[in-house]
Amino acid sequence: MSFSSDVKEELAKQVSKSRHCQLAELAGIIELSGRINEKTKGLELDTENLLLLNKYATLMKRAFGTDTTKALDEQDTGKILAALKITAQPVNRQTADGLLLMQTCCRRAFIRGAFMAAGSISDPNKAYHFEIVCHTKEQAKQLQELLCGFDTDAKIVERKGHYVVYIKEGAHIVDSLNIMEAYVSLMKLENVRILKEMRNSVNRKVNCETANISKTVNAAVKQIEAIRLIQKMRGLDDLPAQLREMALLRLEYPDAPLKELGGYLDPPMGKSGVNHRLRKLSAIAEELR
């Protein structure tokens, strides 16, 4: 499976318990992948993607008690579209009503639905690229504003009659996965990103021995992964002051050896002391896994 498929598989398993978030996510799906059947006048999805169809079916069942294995009639469709504030046709060229996006959790859900319906993300080992393809400029602008509201650098480009909302910066793609709550995929991408940054930095340090470089990189990656996990699951502010200081230092200087890290402390600390604190952080992260 591709990395993009892995992300969607993870998102497909997430179903909000709140109906308002379910409606927001459905709006994101329908407004980019929905259509009205000309014969039955019922709502359906214009896709063969099983992950999307299953997620759509689950959300429709939770939010409306609707069985999507049976064709929706015009009356049921009208009720559903009214609840989703979709009042015009075609349904896949509308923008979301602001009432559906008033809460932060609902904005996250809408973005998640839009990505499930029309998004993709490249293999981070090859390139950094996140995108969602919209039918109209208005849809793209709304989605861009929502993503930028979470401090991502989302941009728009026109491509073959569609409007593509995209993100190229690796850190902002990590943020987009966080927005959609794809935490497993986030950690995978973050690990790749850290490795790339570390290797780029290491390549500039021509006086280092290859074996020591590999050992330092691998150890630092594991340390940063542990700190990121603590940050996501618990928050660094909850740590004892000494461990919080060490965690922040490791994040600020991802490629620094233990001796250099110790020099940034006040008073300075030796390699063994730095290593002891980093091991404590790793132990905390292990308990959270």
Give the ranges of each region predicted by the language model:
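Short acidic, hydrophobic short linear motifs in intrinsically disordered regions
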Residues: K39-L43, N125-A127, P257-K259
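N-terminal low-complexity or simple alpha-helical regulatory segments
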Residues: M1-K85, Q89
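Short acidic (Asp/Glu) and glycine-rich catalytic loops that position anionic groups and cofactors
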Residues: I36-N37, D123, I156, R204, ...
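DNA-contacting interfaces and partner/effector-binding or oligomerization modules
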Residues: T47, N54, T58-E190
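Structural motif
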Residues: V15-L23, L100-R107, D237-A241
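Short, hydrophobic/amphipathic alpha-helical patches that form generic packing surfaces
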Residues: A24-L32, A109-A117, L248
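Short, solvent-exposed alpha-helical "recognition" segments
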Residues: L278-R289
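Extended mid-to-C-terminal alpha-helical interaction segments
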Residues: E181-R279
